[in-house]
Amino acid sequence: DNISYFIKGIYRGKKIALIIDENVDNLYGCKIRTHLIDNGFSVKTISIRGGEGSKSLRILDSIYRKLLDFNITRGDLIIVMGGGVAGDVGGFAAATYLRGMDFIHIPTTLLAQIDSSIGGKVAVNLPEGKNLVGSFYQPKGVFIDPNLLCTLDTREFNNGMAEAIKYACIADKNLFHQLLMLSKEEIDREIEDIIFTCCNIKGKIVMEDEKDRGNRMLLNFGHTIGHVIEKYFNYEKYTHGEAIAIGMYNITLKSEIAGYTKEGITHQIKEVLEKFGLPYRLPDMDRGEILKTLALDKKSKGNNIDIILIKDIGEGIIKNLSRKIFFKEFFPHKTKSGGAI
């Protein structure tokens, strides 16, 4: 209800392009457009479908063309409203249209509020893998309203909780135990504080390493295996959070066996994942396809790859391994359906 007040603090123009997830448009589109128009703005809407399929060059091209049709100039403003997909493709459009224009982000899913809306990473996918074309481009503002989460179903809420668990694993033991011990009702009551804690963790890391060359890689805990799973199943079988949950558990399982991780940590991760209905068993996948996806991982450096592990709950570490050793250690044979690595 107060978004125009904040916009006027950072934007003196009148024309706004609203890039919005179509489901969010159905829920809130009329309200936000009416609010903006009543406060003197001219609004043009670009609605996109949710899901990873919209993080494509084809959708990006359609956004560019609509921005041109609307005569959006470099001095105008883009508002991106939706979950992680809308934020990624809408943010990348803002970063590249006319060599970059201002945008603000209104994240509407838990995952977007605690993770993808913070830090300035924007990207689209290629058929070969996730987030292969992208940039670092900071929005002028991110406006987080936990009340927008009331329309999320349980699976989508838990999708976001997977990223909260990630933050707890790499940086905040107290948050981990809070997530493990609080009831569902208590989690709901404390969600604003949980969001703030996660944003604070990420914000501090990003301020130290905006371009992802050092400690920001810690935010990729679970993502190396997780992205493989998402790509392998064409972004259809598992949500992002579910794939990351499987990645966190299995990377820690092997890390504990190898002696990098304190004994018993894998079991604790399993406990908290099960509490939020998140999977942990690695699905059946072909090793050749896994290797192709790993070869494109952005943490690869020549024949090596940076792997994110945890020594203990709240203590993430970066381990540089040869891709050959990593593949042999973590994918020793074709995985069997329903089993861990």
Where are these regions (language model features)?
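A glycine/threonine-rich phosphate-anchoring loop and its flanking beta-alpha core
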Residues: 92-182
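Active-site segments that bind and position negatively charged phosphate/pyrophosphate groups
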Residues: 177-288
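A generic, well-ordered mixed alpha/beta core segment in the N-terminal half of proteins
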Residues: 78-81, 85-99
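Short glycine/serine/threonine-rich phosphate/pyrophosphate-binding segments
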Residues: 27, 85-92, 113, 227-228
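Hydrophobic/aromatic beta-strand patches that form the interior of the parallel beta-sheet core
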Residues: 44-46, 79, 104-106, 141-144, ...
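ATP/NTP phosphate-donor binding region
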Residues: 1-76
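C-terminal charged capping/lid subdomain of soluble metabolic enzymes
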Residues: 162, 260-341
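Residue-level signal for inorganic ion chemistry
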Residues: 18, 56, 107, 145, ...
